[in-house]
Amino acid sequence: MAKATAFDAAEYLDTNMVRLTFFGRHQDGHRDLVAPLRQAEEAMAGQTVSPPITSFGCLVPRPIRGTTNRLSNHALGRAFDLNPTGNPRITQAVDYLVIAAATGTDLHQLRRETDPATLSRISRAFQDSFTEAWASSQTEPNILAALQNRGVRERLNGYARHGICTLYVPLIQALIAAGLVWGGAWPSSKDFMHFELRR
């Protein structure tokens, strides 16, 4: 078995990394992203992408979150994130519980939902419904406990302020149609900003 060396990493980067361009934003990433990004951008020709792409991040050397020995797809340049502020990664079960309650969405349906248009509607519904008046009217013990936890409340307030799935839905659909995997469709944790090459 070959031993990994710094030279291997340098060779991988030299062989696979190129300058990517997406809606006027530039980022280094894997050469296999060129075609799907171009295809998605061409699919948007004549449309106004709203909200516009304000952040495009790709190559970030780091392990997969929660691990120390497995490189993330970002470390390999095979994944990118778009507009993270309004498209967060949601991992905490309590966040899903409150989002479901505030929007009247079935919790299990929310976790399993893969349709960008439906998730975008849930995002807007949460922004509209998660208010002080709604929070003060809650009586369910798990919801109350979540709302009283400072860290949880700060995250929820951020979701209400910025949204959870605010990317232009036709753009998400175009990126998926171009063969990319969307993190917003994952059932265990949703990463609405995240797109990656299929393995």
Regions inferred by a protein language model and the residue ranges of each:
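Catalytic cores and adjacent binding grooves of peptidoglycan-active enzymes
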Residues: T67-R199
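Active-site-adjacent substructure of cysteine-protease-like catalytic cores
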Residues: G46-A75
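Active-site acidic/histidine clusters and adjacent loop/turn architecture
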Residues: M1-T54
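Intrinsic-disorder/low-complexity coil detector
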Residues: A35, S50-P51, V60-R62, N87, ...
